Amino acid sequence: MQSYLQYRRIGQVVRKQFADHPEWGQRVQGESTDPSGNTSENDETVWEKRSESRPLALPPGVQRRDITDSSGTPSSVFLVSWEQDQDPMNPRNYSMTARITATLIVSALAFAVGAASSIESAVIPQNAAAFNVSEVVASLATGLYLLGFAAGSLVSGPLSEILGRNAVYIGSLTLFMIFIMASGLAPNIGAQLAFRFLAGVFGCPPLTCAGGTIADLWNPLEKTLTFPLYAILSFGGPVFGPVIASYMGQGTLSWRWTNWIMLIMSGLVMGLILLLQPETYGPLLLKWKAAHLRQVTGDKRYRSAMDVQKIALVERILGACKRQFSLTVHEPIILLISLYMTVIYIVLFTFFDGYPFIFQDVYGLSQGLTNIVWVAMYVGIAAAGLWVPVVYGWTKREFEAASSSSTTTTSGTGVVPCVTGIDPNVNAEGEHGQQEQEPEGGRDEQNTKNPHPARPENRLWFAMLGAPFIPIGLFWMGWTDYVRHTPNPQLKTTFPPNTNKVTIK
């Protein structure tokens, strides 16, 4: 719903602009010369038919480009990009309230699918008894859900770059809810495990694409504040899953209510997405704008980058899958971070099965109270927020230094920086001469609102600060896991490892 209204608003803006500037819609006959300079009659006829007519003046943010299609035929298009630094249609220029709301909704979505990953661990004894299997087999409900995450992540990213963020969120969440419901109705353990795996496949897009949504809304410096917020809230899902199901299956409330609770929670988040979440993927918004420009002007040459660079869905998905393995092989830093993240998630989800052995077998706590112990773990996750102001200050100074260095270099070479929104190659008639290629990502990368790119290593501050906490916490836990100690030291050991989880993410 919100995406549809957003599409309508873009159309209203385009129509109003053309009503205020009627000269943008005036036309003259196109050139009769081939872009290569040939002037043969045959070439002239072909080029005239191809170019037809063009606007006398192009709207802001539209540039004329000569391109060659897949068949080798040259053609001219009007490439649609952001109008200016403060283009209101650019997601990074939404109001602060709108951007925070969108970030919180994505965080709530990640919380819901994250909670579904761990909530079954709270009712493993009841699940095993109901299906007459061992608790080890029943614990596969959690493991297969995570395998579904891994499988779905290969496809969800490329899909969001074709269909947009909201389409992937809504479509995947709908299927996720269907399979969660099927898991709750499963008549045997085999059916439940199969449906849990499929729920994981369709539950992964919020986690895979959420980083893209955050990047759509916030510039690199702002992400130093907003991404930890998203990480702290989203990591609350796996932690609070067992807390939500603490006493399910032990009284009148069936253990199957773990699925119904997740279904209700997912439905509420779905309502928020439909009613409040705007589309944030910039290339798709520009595609919508180009479609409205074609409709208003009748000129089919208005195109966005997505229209010009047509890549089949299957080809894009295969390319994304290949890229992940290629980067892992050729980029050691990606391989190392991936392995480290794997270890961290192994530690996190090992706790789901390990806590009952510690707090029930050693300290004699009840099943429900053992699940509530997970609240202490979230304190450690939230504590990672204490590092945010410190790292933000370091990051800000890094960006300022990079910007200052860039300005000095530009001044020393005598290069006049191009002001976004003013194309020095455009004449008074809106015609374009030879132009340099825009940087990847369009003019938004040169947006003066966005800080100059700094060193990639700058993003490792959080990771370096949090890395020591994993071994400290695990050593602490092993050292105090004896009946002669009270449960208090064990509760405190949950803080350090979970602080690390957020800082690494």
Outline where the language-model segments fall:
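Extracytoplasmic
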Residues: 98-135, 351-356
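Helix-breaking motifs and short loop linkers at transmembrane-helix boundaries and internal kinks
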Residues: 116, 131-132, 155, 163-164, ...
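Cytoplasmic helix-loop-helix junction between adjacent transmembrane helices
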Residues: 195-233
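Intrinsically disordered, low-complexity terminal tails of fungal membrane proteins
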Residues: 1-95, 281-320, 394-457
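Extracytoplasmic gate region of multi-pass secondary transporters
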Residues: 121, 326-379, 385
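Structural signature of the two symmetry-related core transmembrane helices
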Residues: 167-181, 403-406, 412, 447-448, ...
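Glycine-rich segments within core transmembrane alpha-helices of 12-TM secondary carriers
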Residues: 222-250, 265-266, 380-385
